[in-house]
Amino acid sequence: MSEIKDVIVQGLWKNNSALVQLLGLCPLLAVTSTATNALGLGLATTLVLTLTNLTISTLRHWTPSEIRIPIYVMIIASVVSAVQMLINAYAFGLYQSLGIFIPLIVTNCIVVGRAEAFAAKKGPALSALDGFSIGMGATCAMFVLGSLREIIGNGTLFDGADALLGSWAKVLRVEIFHTDSPFLLAMLPPGAFIGLGLMLAGKYLIDEKMKKRRTEAAAERALPNGETGNV
């Protein structure tokens, strides 16, 4: 159970692919102009990570080490192609919006990195969980960045959600504030870099605060009964 918890915590927070490893920044910065686009690509990446980790882990004993990387890429490309066709069939609006960034999941360092670092060494169930956790960590980072950029840039949230979830999702659109002209800095790549920088700073501050609390708690436990540590 502790290993399962560690895999989940590492993927979602401690070893977050976007905020710690800084992998896959090209789609992270390019696609997160809206929360819907960010969520769509994040979920697609999560599905690819889960399936590729599961497949690579299952076949790890029959994969020659000398040619393992080309085999990994072939497996990843096959899964990405299947996911791309699914999005094209059931979410065509999202497919048009994401464009080239769906097939570019094949070259995403996150996917190849988890295949080599984890799936090739661990069992199928734990590898699938690792892929799901890493993918959801990246999805959360994309969604937060996309939401911030959409709110600041257009004053809306979940604009175009029907492209991802169907016509019923039009009711999810929220207008935070009305604007006649969008704030282009937030919608363009410079806004993505600024937003990512703020998120990195926020994560650092949270980690430092949590570290300080753990240190103080450990110091209090180490004190003899009745002592407070004050002079």
Swiss-Prot record:
InterPro entries: NqrDE/RnfAE, RnfE
GO BP annotations listed: electron transport chain
Membrane topology, record value: Multi-pass membrane protein
Keywords: Cell inner membrane, Cell membrane, Electron transport, Membrane, Translocase, Transmembrane, Transmembrane helix, Transport
EC number, UniProt record: 7.-.-.-
UniProt superkingdom: Bacteria
Compartments in which it is found: Cell inner membrane
Short name of one Pfam family: Rnf-Nqr
Gene Ontology, cellular component aspect: plasma membrane
TM annotation in the entry: 18-38, 39-59, 63-83, 86-106, 125-145, 182-202
HAMAP family: RsxE_RnfE
Subunit structure: The complex is composed of six subunits: RsxA, RsxB, RsxC, RsxD, RsxE and RsxG.
Protein family membership: Belongs to the NqrDE/RnfAE family.
Known role: Part of a membrane-bound complex that couples electron transfer with translocation of ions across the membrane. Required to maintain the reduced state of SoxR.
Name of the molecule in the record: Ion-translocating oxidoreductase complex subunit E
The species this protein was found in: Escherichia coli O6:K15:H31 (strain 536 / UPEC)
Taxonomic lineage from the root: Bacteria, Pseudomonadati, Pseudomonadota, Gammaproteobacteria, Enterobacterales
